[in-house]
Amino acid sequence: MAPTRRSRDLLRGKNVLIIGGTSGIGFAVAQLVIEHGAMACIAGSNPTKLGKALDALKQHPDRDPIAIVQSATCDLFDVPNLEQNLDNLLKLAAGDSKIHHIVFTAADMVQPPPLASVTIEQIQRVGTIRFTAPMLVAKLLPKYMELCPENSYTLTSGSHAKQPDPGWSLVTGYCGGVEGLMRGLAVDMMPLRVNVVSPGAVLTPVLRDILGDSLEIALDAARKKSTTGRIARPEDVAEAYLYIMKDQNITGTVLETSAGMLLR
């Protein structure tokens, strides 16, 4: 009987692209990836944040000695050049070989506008990063990734898709759209595995910026709504993405990591 590979070895030497890997959940995924001996390419639109994230990953104390880290700037709001920007990103991440896993965590994390005042421009802007960009990645990735069950493409939605909060219709709509897109891609791109991670409340730097003085009130409400009584950290949720990369039997699935908030 052939020896069983350790779970930690399943990502060793693999090439992982994290789009939105400069902070929050995406950055936490990158940390886990390099702890497992994989090459991580993080992509973001802000060169300053990208540089700081790259330096932090290179200095990560638990980084496996064989892990390689690189970064790439990619403006997901540059609609006229979006497809070319993404193609350039995928080409850079693939290098002389192929990409094995792609994680898409990028999002326009701002307080959504009230329904009564939402504009076409705002609808399109949110849709560009949450729906259009992930779909274009799917269109382009066969040039840079082998479509096989060992590889994966993981998108991100949110608990809003199943349990909307007042005033979040714009984000709720696209979260649901991403989950539908994932199912379509899982069929169109088989046997490549395509899945979605759906986080609940996660305490990220961006969330702190959005909520400002209302942060503690919002966190207290989220704790009471959950069954665990706690708010997730990015590193908690990042484990869901690692699981999807490793489990070659999971595809077409929304993996909820929401502290039981959907139960109440």
UniProtKB/Swiss-Prot annotation:
Listed pathway(s): Alkaloid biosynthesis
Gene3D superfamilies found in the cross-reference section: NAD(P)-binding Rossmann-like Domain
GO CC term, one of those recorded: membrane
Subcellular location field: Membrane
GO molecular function: oxidoreductase activity
Glycoprotein listed as a keyword: yes
Keyword entries, A-Z: Glycoprotein, Membrane, NADP, Oxidoreductase, Transmembrane, Transmembrane helix
Biotechnology: Malbrancheamides have the ability to inhibit calmodulin, calmodulin-dependent phosphodiesterase (PDE1), and induce both endothelium-independent and endothelium-dependent relaxant effects, suggesting their potential as vasorelaxant agents.
Listed name of the protein: Short-chain dehydrogenase/reductase malC
Gene source species: Malbranchea aurantiaca
